[in-house]
Amino acid sequence: MSEDAQAPQEYGADSIKVLKGLEAVRKRPGMYIGDTDDGSGLHHMVYEVVDNGIDEALAGHADHVTVKIHADSSVSVSDNGRGIPVDIHPEEGVSAAEVIMTQLHAGGKFDSNSYKVSGGLHGVGVSVVNALSDWLELRVWRNGKEHVARFEGGETAEHLKVVQECGDRTGTEVRFLASTDTFSNLEYSFETLEKRLRELAFLNSGVRIILIDERPAERLETELFYEGGVKEFVKYLDRSKTPAMPEPIYIKGERDDIGVEIAMWWNDSYHETVLPFTNNIPQRDGGTHVAGFRGALTRTINNYAQSSGIAKKEKVSFTGDDAREGLTCVLSVKVPDPKFSSQTKDKLVSSEVRPAVESLMNEKLAEWFEENPNEAKGIVGKIIEAALAREAARKARELTRRKTAMDVNYLAGKLKDCSEKDPSKTEVFLVEGDSAGGSAQTGRDRLTQAVLPLRGKILNVERARFDRMLSSQEIGNLVMALGTGIGRDEFNIEKLRYHKIVIMTDADVDGAHIRTLLLTFFYRQMPELIEGGYLYIAQPPLYKVSRGKSEVYLKDQAALDDYLIHQGVEGAVLKLGSGEEIVGQDLTRVVDEARQLKRVLDAFPTHYPRHILEQAAVAGAFVPGAVDADLQGVADKVAARLDLIALEYERGWQGRVTQDHGIRLARILRGVEEVRTLDGPMLRSGEARKTGSFTQSLQEIYNTPATLVRRDRSQDIHGPLDLLRAILEEGEKGLSLQRYKGLGEMNPDQLWETTLDPDARTLLQVRVDDMVEADDLFTKLMGDVVEPRREFIQQNALSVENLDF
């Protein structure tokens, strides 16, 4: 064999890759920033830069951080801190700002004199953001001068230079455009950013964080500023619950260089919410700070109950679980050198934090109990109630165990089990009512599919105590069918009899209500099933379409539109003004583009008429740059296109430029002036940019009127929405459409084909991405307090589709 052929298999020193500078980050971005496909990594880029501003605030040098999402999907973060150092770095020979931007593990976080504690991650922070951006612009206001540097692809494109004087202003601004080579999309979620920035504003009281989004047609802005810090955070978390005390207990102090801040109170619910943070970073899985807090809480309350004589009088002993029933707490620690169980920082393992939290909590909580005897008695009374309910539940459970032999026979009459005993291969369908249960039992695969019909509405567990819940027949059946047991001491996920639990309810209001009640039950009583990915929601079809003898089942509106477009395009020809004809697959592509554009236009506020937006899109009013180059010319084009689609006696549109560089369109109709305005900020928004990306292909097709011909019928087409409407109408001709409301309307064969057959069905897996939001939503929708529920309905009423009376 020749040497050349052998060479690739040699493993020598030159096979070892040393990834210099930021190359390592671009090679393995997930290690540094998280998932680059699901959006979490993209948002993490913003948090990395924000953390620098927050660290300045923690060090006492800043009180303002502004985050702005620009229309081009770039993001800028500015603060009024000291400004990144701009002097020349002694070792590197370039400005310190450039070293921070272009080298991993460079920064002030490793020098404990600059920052005592910091939230910024492994010293990779802003250099990682630079590495994963197409471009990044840095502005520094320091020493009376404004300095600017630009980086492209992680490398310095323009060295730091002074551009002007800036007086007393100090601070830093970083603006970056994330790279599409790394991230599959650049869609920032305003809600996701707002949630994290709100956490930071609560945890750092006195810091004002402003979030601005310039992408929508009407820009969004929110200011997050909380003087009360974690006390305000606790009130915010419990905004939909009834507190058991007027003000939260607030504890703040320092032990062995570890700063501890705790705010807590009890409410009228039966669930515990503890949110732990270390240096502003949340820990989903708790850690030593939570262990210290829980130990001290139980011990202090026990001591108070003994010393005040309440425990003796009530003759009941309570556990930590009883003490934490209905407790909401935010626990924030500031640790100089924290240790976590993994890179994601979901669990704190620094052993020195536990005694620090425990001793401070013991001392301060005992003081609070002594100083507030009335409230202390109320809290202990609530905990004793929880202990008595736990005792009652234990007795109810023992009773249930004794009845098991009878119950198994009773359950056998309800649960139609499957013959397979391996849980990983089996699934159980929770079906609404006996009629649907009958169809499901007949249509299922008896080897792997079990069916449990639920009669009526199950108990709302949000408002029920544990002992009352156990006495509910339907919940008893459900727990017995799953086999896991229920309650903190009894629940065992290893005993789960089915690895797919599928909620299958009707597509009407009652079905939605029963599904919500079941989700509330699983979220509150068996959250491990959701975390393990065992809970699903079936998607029975919403429509049946018949033509002659053929029948098709369609799961939702989008599937129906697909079907109608397929039917409408068949035999249709779109004749363009240029003489070109579009048919078949090409016509389907044009109609699909019209659907995409409709989705983009639907995101604009409703006071912009859709037909005006449609014609403005064809005229090029949304193309970035073109608008600024010749806005009057664009206004004239839009007016001309509106005249084109108007009846002869309704024409006369005039376009002119407004003061905010928008377009004013007006016509006189029956002696009255009709005015429509496309605002300047809207024409430059992110939504406008998305619309502008369609303009070139729209002009190729609709610049001059087109004609749609199908089966000897023809109609003029003036725009994409016009075409979509015409094709859908053509597709509907000769069809019979049935909308299903109940599963009982289907016979067993239909149910198998559409909903039960693993090869053909669609299942939605239930996941919880944000525990705080989920907790608040269940409390709002299912809790006792009416006002937050009414507000929720008013805010979301207009978004409802398929309202069923």
Which residues fall in each region the model found?
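Conserved phosphate-chemistry cores used by DNA topoisomerases
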Residues: 1-805
